[in-house]
Regions:
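Noncatalytic alpha-helical scaffold of FAD-dependent oxidoreductases
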Residues: 1-278
Length: 278
């Protein structure tokens, strides 16, 4: 048994048993719950109005990590930063490139919790190549609105028969279940990454560059058009630029990346004065 004070408005459980008790109590009293992790995305969309808040920031930690088997199992409140630091030790990554919205809303890094990342299904530039967050979830445990435990999947890629619930809860914004544990596929980091910076293209030309590049056999892993009115804020490595630009990223083994960058430059018909390579 746990000793929770149900008169408080913010619950900060440290165990799954406490989460179950909180949800069951709120269900019996018909009290809606707002679910929070590290609040990195609470300024996105319409705020949820509720009497009680379930704060999962103390329900954190890496449960299991097997680099050789390419998976990590974590509690939902675990900071993304902590997971990335652990993966860095083995030159591995979350290939879907989770976003860091902290700079946008608070001016400092706050990449949030892994539960928030999965609940929102927000992926980065590599999404068109490797898939979204839901494509990297091997399994999960969660608690539904009645306080019942739900389990799906496991720790290997082909571990689901029937409907894959991981696909359903990813991007559900906490409306279907409170995620408690997640098993996630990890992948090796690319050996090299280079970015083609094309200077001052107008919008139509930039879209043409991106369309050709992303459908090219050079296999880019990211692309973006950066309008000129953002130019004053642009800094990438040592490059500063005060006009519009298009950036196209290529990753992989060093020799392969060099060859593909050169080939893509030729395919796009770029002159040396029009581009930089970072």
């Amino acid at each position: 048994q746990t000793s929770l004070d149900f008169n408080q408005n913010i619950f900060k459980p440290t165990s799954r048993e406490e989460i179950v008790e909180i949800v069951k109590n709120c269900y019996k009293k018909n009290i809606p719950l707002e679910i929070n992790g590290l609040k990195s995305k609470n300024k996105i969309g319409r705020n949820f109005q509720s009497e009680k808040t379930l704060d999962l920031s103390d329900y954190k930690g890496i449960i299991d990590y097997k680099p050789e088997e390419l998976y990590i199992k974590v509690k939902a409140g675990t900071p993304l930063k902590e997971i990335i630091e652990e993966l860095d030790k083995n030159n591995q990554q979350l290939a879907f490139e989770p976003n860091d919205f902290g700079y946008l809303f608070s001016g400092e890094s706050n990449s949030g919790s892994i539960g928030g990342v999965v609940s929102c299904n927000f992926a980065g530039s590599r999404r068109f190549k490797v898939g979204s967050v839901r494509d990297h979830i091997l399994g999960f445990q969660g608690i539904n609105g009645k306080g019942e435990t739900i389990k799906s999947g496991g720790t290997v890629v082909k571990n689901v028969t029937g409907y894959d619930l991981s696909k359903l809860v990813s991007g559900s914004f906490g409306t279907l279940t409170i995620l408690t544990e997640l098993s996630i596929k990890v992948l090796p980091k690319p050996e090299t990454s280079k970015t083609l910076i094309i200077k001052n293209p107008h919008l139509k030309k930039a879209l043409d560059f991106l369309g050709k590049a992303l459908s090219s056999s050079t296999d880019p892993s990211g692309g973006v058009f950066y309008p000129d009115y953002f130019g004053k804020d642009f800094v990438l490595n040592d490059l500063t630029h005060d006009g519009g630009l298009t950036a196209i990223r290529i990753e992989g083994p060093t020799n392969s990346v060099d060859q593909r960058v050169n080939r893509l430059s030729k395919e796009l018909g770029l002159l040396d004065q029009e581009l930089s390579i970072l």
